[in-house]
Amino acid sequence: MRDMEGEKPMDHDVSRALIETVVRRTLTEMRADPERSIRILVDMALAVSKGRFQQRFFGIAQRMLEDESSPYYRLAHDTISYVDIDKLLRFGMNLGYNSCTEGAQMIRTLKMEKDIGVPWTQRITLPEPFDDERQERLSRLIGKGESLGIYTWMIFSEDRPVDALHVIGDHLDSAFFLFCNSGGLSRECLERLSELDNVMCVLRFDDEAEAGTAKLRKKGILYSVYLPYSTGDIDQILSGAWFEEAEALSPVFTCLLAEKGCSEKAIKKAAAFAQTALDEQRYRTLPVEFSSVIEEVGWIISGDPEQADLKNIKG
């Protein structure tokens, strides 16, 4: 696979070090003046953005933050109040720089030079039992993905999220979204999560979510929530009721996740509603529809709808 590999984004990267220094200082200042610090951070990010995705994302963010009453300021203030600076910095740099900047460039290069459609992220559901052999296999798969430019991972381990944490800890240059149930947040899991800076916990939004997010806040762990939905739930989604309930827990993202069998029509409606709600800044959380965001970012990064499964890329 050596001929397909690029230099890893973190190798002797002066640009990353300089950006990280500025971001750390701005995050520290954000606790005193979140509105001004966020605007500075977004303006700086837009100024140094090289790729299409970053320029589009930060351009939109810049326009949104012109509204001084934006609920996203309150979201940022709340997040910075409980999450450790190192966690925000590591996760943000892994996602924004390693994945969407340098990793995206590696993916585009592979597409242009070798016509290989590498996905920008991978969704992985952990099997049970997740023994040592399977952990090693997953770690090798992630290492392979990183060599191709994949530095964002969606890990689903609903009942035993602790099983994923050893592998996550072995890949500190990647950003991991760990989808799980509140019931899976054992004492061991919470302690290990608190030690890792490259993971965002994404809790299922259900009757236990309030207690689950309270545990995460107490440990200073970055979190979002997800809401599984089916075709029959579309009216409730379009009413905005789910997002109104979710924002009370102050999640960074509130993610709609279509269940198996959900119709394409329902998914498109959910995605359109989430995008409109995001653009209009309706809630103190960032509403997204999972599959549509994955697809849109992939399009922006590589312009390729036919992206190969990582397991099928030879190397």
Residue ranges, per PLM feature:
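Accessory C-terminal segments flanking Radical SAM cores
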Residues: 2-39, 43-55, 59-63, 266-315
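N-terminal [4Fe-4S]-dependent radical SAM core
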Residues: 51-124
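Short acidic, glycine/proline-enriched helix-loop-strand junctions
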Residues: 163-181, 272-284
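A short acidic (Asp/Glu
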Residues: 164-167, 189-190, 267
